[in-house]
């Protein structure tokens, strides 16, 4: 699962997001399957692993 946090909204998706035609996700490869925020990337232990910003384009209609 890939957890994305945007503002106060939390959404979870499988990493096969191609199943959603409206989902366009651009994430830093260094983040792997970590937790993503709008400006900072964290791994599954909450450790900051890469600076932002994470680009979310047409993510929620």
Swiss-Prot record:
Task: Please give the superkingdom of this protein's source.
Answer: Eukaryota
Main localization of the protein described in the UniProt heading = mitochondrion
Name the UniProt key words of this record, in alphabetical order.
Mitochondrion
A cellular component term from Gene Ontology for this protein is:
mitochondrion
Subcellular location field: Mitochondrion
Put simply, this protein is called Uncharacterized mitochondrial protein ymf31
């Amino acid at each position: 699962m890939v957890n994305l946090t945007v503002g106060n909204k939390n959404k979870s998706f499988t990493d096969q997001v191609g199943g959603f035609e409206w989902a366009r996700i651009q994430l830093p490869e260094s983040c792997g399957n970590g937790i993503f925020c709008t400006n900072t990337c964290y791994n599954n232990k909450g450790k900051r692993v890469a600076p932002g910003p994470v680009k979310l384009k047409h993510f929620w209609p």
